[in-house]
């Protein structure tokens, strides 16, 4: 059992480091290639550039938090930071999905003129759901159903 726990810890730490690196990289892209992201911001939100920059800041911060979490998992016996980082990552993925949904429903092209096929959008949705699940796993999230009557 100790061997399996060690393997799970390594996978969780690696997942946090990879997820954090991805978020950090994409967050930086929000500043270096703003026009690529702007078309997928739903008009109802107002200034696309504002939301691209704000989401870039959020992705960089969540990325750093997940990288720290990965290091914490590898070098500490606690997952204190990971609980917060994992929940923040899951929440960010949920909050960013309206842009992906808008892109899918209205067949919006990205800043470089590329667009996803219907299969690509489904794959992206599944990746987003998987990312949320991995984020909650990193956070050691547990939801227990309780009977409120007794």
Question: Can you annotate each of these PLM segments?
Answer:
Residues 2-150:
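Membrane-interface extramembranous regions
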């Amino acid at each position: 059992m100790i061997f399996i726990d060690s393997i799970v810890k390594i996978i969780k730490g690696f997942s946090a480091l990879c997820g954090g690196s991805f978020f950090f990289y994409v967050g930086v892209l929000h500043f270096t290639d703003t026009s690529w992201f702007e078309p997928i911001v739903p008009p109802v939100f107002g200034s696309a550039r504002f939301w691209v920059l704000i989401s870039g800041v959020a992705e960089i911060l969540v990325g750093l938090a997940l990288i720290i979490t990965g290091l914490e998992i590898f070098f500490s016996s606690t997952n204190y930071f990971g609980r917060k980082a994992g929940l923040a990552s899951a929440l960010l993925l949920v909050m960013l999905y309206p842009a992906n949904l808008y892109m899918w429903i209205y067949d919006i092209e990205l800043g470089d003129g590329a667009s996803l096929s219907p299969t690509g959008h489904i794959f992206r949705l599944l990746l987003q759901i998987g990312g949320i699940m991995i984020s909650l796993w990193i956070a050691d999230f547990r939801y227990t159903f309780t009977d409120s009557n007794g």
